[in-house]
Amino acid sequence: MSNDDLRRARSSLAEAELAQRPSDRYLAAHLAALRVVAIVLTHRAPPGTVRLEGRPRNAWRMLADVAPELAEWAAFFAATEGKRDAIRGGATSIVSAREADDLVRDAKAFLHLVERAIGFSAVRERPIDVASS
């Protein structure tokens, strides 16, 4: 995991924790989770799998494919995309403070799980131990 990737994920998470509006917390937490996915994909995805037939592939599906032990996390965060898209479209009241806080907490747990599993070395050979989180 590169320091830049990790720094970007942590920065998004810090932004989520400091944001006043629930919609801003939700968006920043979702971005933090996507940045964590980027870290895993950088280490696990075979070259050329980020794009399929010229179109980008869904990050959550790719995560489940390259790190099956993270499939539940992938499904969870994929399910949050509808609200994220609605917020981006202007429906800022669609998420409650509780939902935003929960997503921040979950994004933080996801980041810590990946940090512990990957550390600063590649993990192509080693699955991520989700039982230890």
Per-range role (PLM):
Residues M1-S133:
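Terminal alpha-helical segments
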